[in-house]
Curated annotation (Swiss-Prot):
Listed HAMAP family: DapB
Gene this protein is translated from: dapB
Keywords on record: Amino-acid biosynthesis, Cytoplasm, Diaminopimelate biosynthesis, Lysine biosynthesis, NAD, NADP, Oxidoreductase
Binding annotation for (S)-2,3,4,5-tetrahydrodipicolinate: 156, 165-166
Residues where NAD(+) binds: 8-13, 34, 98-100, 122-125
Gene3D superfamilies noted in UniProt: Dihydrodipicolinate Reductase, domain 2 (3.30.360.10), NAD(P)-binding Rossmann-like Domain (3.40.50.720)
Active site, UniProt feature: 155, 159
Similarity comment: Belongs to the DapB family.
GO molecular function: 4-hydroxy-tetrahydrodipicolinate reductase; NAD binding; NADP binding; oxidoreductase activity, acting on CH or CH2 groups, NAD or NADP as acceptor
Pathway assignment: Amino-acid biosynthesis; L-lysine biosynthesis via DAP pathway; (S)-tetrahydrodipicolinate from L-aspartate: step 4/4
Protein name: 4-hydroxy-tetrahydrodipicolinate reductase
Function: Catalyzes the conversion of 4-hydroxy-tetrahydrodipicolinate (HTPA) to tetrahydrodipicolinate.
Disulfide partners: none
Record-level GO cellular component terms: cytosol
Amino acid sequence: MTKVIIAGASGRMGQRVAHMVEAHPELEYAAAFEAAGNPAIGKDIGRIVFGEENGVIVGEGLESVIADGDVIIDFTFHTATMEFARIAAKHGKAMVIGTTGLSVDELAELKDLSASFPCVQAPNMSVCVNVLFKLAKKTAAILGDDYDIEILEAHHNKKKDAPSGTALKLAEMAAEGVGRNLAEVGVYERNGIIGERDPKEIGIQTLRAADIVGEHTIYFAGAGERLEISHRAHSRDHFAKGAATAAAWLVGRENGIYDMFDVLGLQDL
């Protein structure tokens, strides 16, 4: 059995990950931790998550539990994620990162760190969303420059980063499909007298409201018609299930960064 350490164990995603780990035949929930000052520290995580004790006591920080597991699953915050990645690299522990909002510099550091540990890093671990990424690239390549590309994403009002990592990945895949550099053509805000739309630009717009789990639509709009491809999440369980799948797949792999295309066997599609 692969022993799993869950970061932010008492949080919303940490609890959903716990359920998916418990349901996975190859995984064992071995350790949990929270940041200093969290009221869950010192308590049995089973009572918090499952309503009954499972013998896993919430530690203070990753270092306090790093020896207890084989792989860390993290859906916390980008600065915390990088701290955990440095610790994972030091100890040679595998890590699954579902945190979004990592900066260019943080991603570069993560790549360097991955020489010392295997890591799955993905903006979205849903099977359907990763299929959507592939569809975005292939559709953009087929339709070409005659179709405007726009992306709309919606999430709950507690989400800290915008646009979502999923929306950015969608835009990157579409840009690849039409041979563009997203850094040059991405548009994230429109306000005032902006003039006509540049036919090469890719728009990415954001909504934040109430308890929306996550919705993404990519539009390919041409003269007289448009194609919309959408994904709507009804719960966080599909993210958590993907993370559990990634954890089971990752342990024992060579050091380096992998993504969900690797985990799901989608690289060549």
